[in-house]
Amino acid sequence: MNISIIQSMINAIDKPAIFITPDYVIHAVNQPYRDTYQDDVITGQSRCHQISHRNTVPCDQAGESCPLAECQQSGRATTVVHNHKTQHGDSYCDILMKPVHDEDGMVLGYLEILERIQYASSQAGKG
């Protein structure tokens, strides 16, 4: 697996994005992702759940659905909404997770792209 090519592709994404392997290890990360979280990402060591949730276990072992596990089971892209621990406190994120295959169809890892969810006020304006 050529991480430098994957890193270049991750860098081309404007939204926070990472490339992770089936063991949850982050192997490529873009600057918007680094800017989102307080903890430093150490490629080849940091795990996605450690950075985004500050958990020692994957999401599905901590009460949330795990998009990586869902991708592994279905073999297809998936989206989930998570509450992440960001630089600015808790923030809801829409997560797109897509499997990345080699030319033989084998899964190399997973592309995760985040979109912060902005909520409108539930109260009608007065005035």
Protein language model annotation of sequence segments:
Residues M1-R34:
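Sensory modules in modular signal-transduction proteins
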Residues R34-H53:
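PAS and related sensory helical modules
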Residues I51-N83:
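Terminal output helix/cap of sensory domains in signal transduction proteins
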Residues V81, Y92-I95, L111:
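PAS/PAC sensory module
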Residues N83-H88, H101:
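PAS-family sensory domains
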Residues V100-G127:
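Sensory coupling linkers of modular signal transduction proteins
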